Amino acid sequence: MPWIQLKLNTTGSQAEDLSDALVESGAVSVTFQDTHDNPVFEPLPGETLLWGDTDVIGLYDAETDMAEVVAMLEQHPLLGAGFRHKIEQLEDKDWEREWMDNFHPMRFGQRLWICPSWRDVPDPDAVNVMLDPGLAFGTGTHPTTALCLQWLDGLDLAGKTIIDFGCGSGILAIAALKLGAARAIGIDIDPQAIQASRDNAQRNGVSERLELYLPKDQPADLLADVVVANILAGPLRELAPLIGCLPKSGGHLGLSGVLATQAASVAQAYEDKFTLDPVAEREEWCRITGQRK
């Protein structure tokens, strides 16, 4: 069905109040958008950061009388008569099809493809991971996931054990298993990620070789030939004493979820235990890799 969108601009501190006003005026949903498209990379747990210049966008049923909506909003003390806003009609689309059309098979390195289930596999003889976008992070579209997949594709994983620390969708652990690893261990703080990883592993026929744990449940003596952690710079620094002990002597470590500007501080947290490689970059993100001394 078609919709009507009303957009107004405000400050981050007033956005929540105006969101409530839009809901009271009949909006079925309200979203916040940075006016200048500046991303927020790493909010603290439980924190919702808003930009200094924020667009508040309300979505209304197509039958809504928008003149009445505007008149109601003009009574709000933060808006007043003649407040600046933009109203536009959104065309009726098959939104599920529109969403699906944005995802295509993607190649990483020489052997590895990540394919959504509704697409044909481009190369049946390649290493193909079937993965659909879901609640947990990791489909290959983000530069950090792509950097990690390329790295895994370049390793000799035959018969190896891998730990995917912060496994999200399980994409890295599953890719490693499909690339020849004998065993993979996924760890995540989010139970939804554990379930998503389990479902994706079953879809790819590798569930019997994938172990999944919440941090409180993981074995104390975990060691692996390869450890990959695609999380964020802050946790990578804070958890360096833990993550750095997971690779065996001579084992490989791959870290991402790190902005290029954060690479030096993250690398510093691991350089005592690892011989580090040159940093790999993609867009504004990077990957730090090394071998356990």
Curated annotation (Swiss-Prot):
Gene3D superfamilies: Vaccinia Virus protein VP39. It catalyses: L-lysyl-[protein] + 3 S-adenosyl-L-methionine = N(6),N(6),N(6)-trimethyl-L-lysyl-[protein] + 3 S-adenosyl-L-homocysteine + 3 H(+). Pfam families: PrmA. GO terms for molecular function: protein-lysine N-methyltransferase activity. SUPFAM superfamilies: S-adenosyl-L-methionine-dependent methyltransferases. Its EC number is 2.1.1.-. Keywords: Cytoplasm, Methyltransferase, S-adenosyl-L-methionine, Transferase. It comes from the Bacteria. It is an enzyme of class 2 (transferase). One of its GO terms (biological process) is methylation. It is found in: Cytoplasm. PANTHER family: ELECTRON TRANSFER FLAVOPROTEIN BETA SUBUNIT LYSINE METHYLTRANSFERASE. Methylates ribosomal protein L11. Belongs to the methyltransferase superfamily. PrmA family. NCBIfam families: prmA. This is Ribosomal protein L11 methyltransferase. It comes from Serratia proteamaculans (strain 568).
